Amino acid sequence: MEEHLFTTQGQAYRIRIAPAAEFATEIEAILAFLIPRAHVEEKYLRNHVPRALVLAVADFEGAIVSVCALKDVNHVHSESVRNSSGYPLPLDLPELGYAATNEHHFGRQLGRHLNEQIILRIKGEAFATVRVGNVAEERNIRRCHFCPRGQTWDRVDNGGKPYQIALWVRRANAPPICDGAPEGVT
């Protein structure tokens, strides 16, 4: 497991990055953090978080305050995304996702930093599905050289409220650092 400190706005966060298996003793705590913040059903989190290729976790004063994952390849999900978006998404790509930050730590660049840590470990293409209007996440993945592809599609959250999802794809030859312009398509 890799570990370092990330200091922002006078706060020091412990950042840990590793395959999900290395977080085995903490998976329940990670799930407890993600479940109330997720846009997907709990069963999907419980199934896929423990199998993530990479987890990036930020702790503050011993508590988890931000998480991001590089999900394992899931052909069934990828085919659903391909069909919903109308974009010819390869079925063997990992997905950047399950990004969440504790509300008391918004605006401190934690999501951006965790995304960057995962991007450094991606070999080849990857994709992300992002809720349309999630400005912070759209900005973060754009900086990491993801580009919107295909059409948006409708979903319904756990409370029955409709929303839209957009597909974003990162090319295999994209720079390994997140230095893209947040306002421009790269």
Spans of model-derived segments:
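Residue-level recognition of the GNAT/N-acetyltransferase active site
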Residues: G97, N102, R131
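Short amphipathic alpha-helix that is part of the acyltransferase structural core
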Residues: E2-K43, D59-F60
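Conserved acyl-donor/pantetheine-binding loop and adjacent beta-alpha core of acyl/acetyltransferases
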Residues: A63-Y98, F106, R155-G160
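Conserved GNAT acetyl-CoA-binding A-motif
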Residues: L120-G133
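Active-site rim helix/loop that mediates acceptor-substrate recognition in acyltransferases
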Residues: A32-A69, N74-V76
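C-terminal "cap" of GNAT-fold acetyltransferases
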Residues: D154-T186
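Conserved acetyl-CoA-binding loop-helix of GNAT-fold acetyltransferases
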Residues: T101, F106-L120, R139, R143
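Conserved active-site alpha-helix within GNAT-family acetyltransferase domains
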Residues: V132-D154
